[in-house]
């Protein structure tokens, strides 16, 4: 089997990027935009499983900086795909003397390449960034073996400051069609769910602050909703909820018509929650104008995604990282063939299907 490869490329007009691939999987990493995982392609089917917004983003450094707050900046440059969310998750906020951006600074900052290793059996790249608005630096190693459709990620945050720092930390992979469809199944090791208590979007059909057991919940009319089955495109839903109480920290989206799926498994000790964001045409104005069809399931240290000060006040699930302290999380994204529902993804990225 050919060895995995790592090559340089340009995305759009000028965004520096890397392509890490083997015979099974190809991924594009945007160095100039948060080290976003822009594509995750299952090569046997030729399908990129990650969602892209219906309207093209403005490229960083091209044209004037958009007016408005950090949410406006995020939406202007958002390319879909998969982001690191750090040190804030949700609305912009002031905390510990710093203005924290919407969804944090890490995803809007250029990262550098710190190390590259390419061998017959494995290719890896180590990326890094030093933040400006908090005393953190982040290191992320991404690796691909020659013979498996499994992308391994090892990410470390380090507090270089003299004081303990509060933060929220997560990953934001967003999945779209054709993987996502009404034929698809969403399976997970989570046992409990809780809807966001402040998400009052017009398309949100779920009651606010409602607890339940995965995957069943009642909508605002009292009708049953099976969250493991995606609604159809254009069905007008806009949902935010949180997955909790994981027996094992994993999820999978399987499309039996296409005969393959995508899954994620991670260290649940550091990321015990996952935000579930779903748009099926519910946001009919800016920024999606009714055209979004996306489900993102986002492992996170904390919940809800309402900004760091709100999380400290509401749930106390934020991280506190001491001076000089580091924290490390490991995640694996796996692409797999199959038509049956997934009952488990183990920490090595092996996928187990039901009967």
Locate predicted features.
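Surface-exposed acidic/polar loop and edge beta-strand patches at domain peripheries
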Residues: 1-152, 163-166, 170-355
